[in-house]
Every structure is written in C-alpha cells, then in structure tokens.
Amino acid sequence: MIAEANAPDRTAPVRRWATYREYLATADDTRIVEWADGEIIEYMPPLIEHQDLAGFLLQLIGAFVARFNLGKVMIAPTEVKLWPEGPSREPDIFFVPTADLSNFDPWRFNGAPDLVVEVVSPGSVREDRVRKFTEYELAGVREYWLVDPRPHQRTVECYRRDAAGVFAPVDVTEDGRLCSAVLIHAGAPFWLHVDWLWQEPLPKVEAALQQILDSGEQLS
C-alpha cells in the first residue's frame, strides 16, 4: 500500500454517507462520482493538465488497442463495479480485453479491468494511492498505473499483479520506457516513454504510436 498525506485543497472531493442505491441516483455522465465503504465521493472538476494527460493516454492506448483489436478502452465517468456489493469506481482510463467484454452491461463494467490508469489530482492523492490501490489489488486488476503530474512529483508508477495476487512495483527500462504486460500484440508490448508525459506540448499521438509500432516490428 502506498501512503501519502493529502493536504487540504480546493480540489478535495465532497463526501457523504449513502447507500449504493443513492449513489446510482446521484451518478451521471457529467462528473466523476464514486461509491466506497458506504459513502459517495464526488470529485471537483479536474485541472487542465490532468485532462491533457488523460486525453493523451486515452488516445495513445486507444489507438494501440484499436489497431490490433485487443478489446475496449474506456474513460471516466464510467462505473466499474469491482465486485458484487463492493466499491464502484470511475477510473480515469481502463482497458478490458476482448474475452471480458461480456462483463459490460448497459450502465457499467462488472469486475476487474486488466489495466487501470489514474492521473493523480491534488484532491485525489489518498484515494488513488491508498484506497483505490487496495481495492484494485483485491479485485484482481492486472496492472495499475499511477501518473502524478504535480510539480513536486512528476512520476509514473506501475504495479503489476504477481503470482500471489499482490501488486508488485515495475521499474521503467534503462531508456525510460514503461512497458505493459497487459497490452501486447504478437509478443510486442505497448510502451511509453515516461518523459513524453512531461513534454510541453505533449507529443503527437500519431508520432508516439509509430515509435511503439516500429519497435514492435524490430522484435518480430
């Protein structure tokens, strides 16, 4: 489990006790609202940097997944019911392989996605790094990425489910790549240069995807 203090911030989520039924009546498609441990967690609108990063990752991962027909990539606010009677989260990005697409119903995904990506906001630190970390691990998420763009952080962390069902940290390669064990085609993994996320402006999705595809061809 990752622990970090979360100082008061205007982006801190609003919390109130509620049943799951009350959560369903509150949630909509215009804001991120989650339900865990008997409380509704309503998040403030994210910062522009958060949305820029989430949008870049969604497009890049989505393009790779679509090119090889690997499954489905979703973005918040989409409910993920991690287990029956368990928490309902709305990850910034999540990936579901083709074999698990039947776990979608018209309103939500039921179960653990293979990949979850959360972009940390000042008000979501404890949720992303402690509570969700534990929930995703228990639910069986195979890979969890934490992208923290805060100026004093600027980190990307990857945790991968090991044989014991526990999240284990994954190091980036010597040249700064984060390689996925979940997003793979013909033995070649999806990867990204961590430095891409801190470039201004962010790289063009098409150019980044081509680098990924070119490296895969070299491995084949």
For the regions a language model picked out, list residue spans one by one.
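Gly/Pro/Ser/Thr-rich low-complexity, intrinsically disordered segments predominantly at protein N-termini
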Residues: M1-S220
